A protein has these predicted regions:
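Q-loop/switch helix immediately C-terminal to the Walker
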Residues: 97, 104-118, 129
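The feature captures the beta-strand-to-loop junction immediately N-terminal to the Walker
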Residues: 41-43
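Conserved ABC ATPase "signature" region
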Residues: 125-144
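Conserved ABC ATPase signature
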Residues: 148-153, 157
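A short, proline-enriched helix->beta-strand linker immediately N-terminal to the Walker B motif
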Residues: 168-172
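ABC ATPase NBD coupling module
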Residues: 64, 76-92, 118
């Protein structure tokens, strides 16, 4: 039987406030199999981002995953440096606000080419590869997007560029 890429079992995320602990997310469980998509839906402040941050090991300083188990490809998700080394290669996070992720001083082309280069794609093929990824996320004229800088993009366009960057990583999650 096929293993889930990600299993999040009975996760509880809590914040330490003075000498007390306040549960922010309680008893969340889900799994994602290869080829599946999962949407975390909830009101503002309901903990969707905290769940994603707990998977990536980047919770704010006074917040932690206090119980539950997270596994990635059948193994307990590592912590610390080992987990950080997986981010961007095996696990990619697409932020709600693409402008926060993109470097405003570098063209979209440069940012995509950097990601594509990490895949080992030959320099002569990077332009076509970048255009293909931008087309996959709905840009009718990817060549024009490559020439732009993040500040020239709308919020939705910036988010689609971050999705294209994630597709360039060929991460599992």
């Amino acid at each position: 039987m096929e293993k889930p890429i990600l299993q999040y079992n009975n996760g509880v995320v809590a914040a330490k406030l003075d000498r007390t602990e306040k549960e922010l997310v309680c008893g969340v469980s889900f799994h994602i199999f290869p080829g599946e998509s999962l949407a975390l839906i909830g009101e503002t402040g309901s903990g969707k981002t905290l769940i994603a941050q707990s998977i990536m090991g980047v919770l704010p300083g006074n917040v932690s995953l206090v119980s539950g188990e997270i596994s990635f490809c059948g193994n307990t998700l590592p912590k610390g440096k080992k987990l950080r080394s997986m981010l961007g290669r095996e696990i990619v996070y697409i932020p709600q606000n693409g402008h926060e992720f993109l470097d405003p001083s570098r063209s979209i082309r440069r940012q995509l080419f950097d990601s594509i280069g990490k895949l080992g794609v030959a320099p002569s093929l990077r332009y076509a590869f970048a255009c293909e990824k931008l087309a996959q996320v709905g840009f009718a004229q990817p060549e024009a997007i490559l020439k732009q800088y993040p500040f020239q993009l709308s919020g939705g366009m910036a988010q689609r560029v971050t999705i294209a960057l994630a597709l360039c990583s060929e991460a599992k999650l």
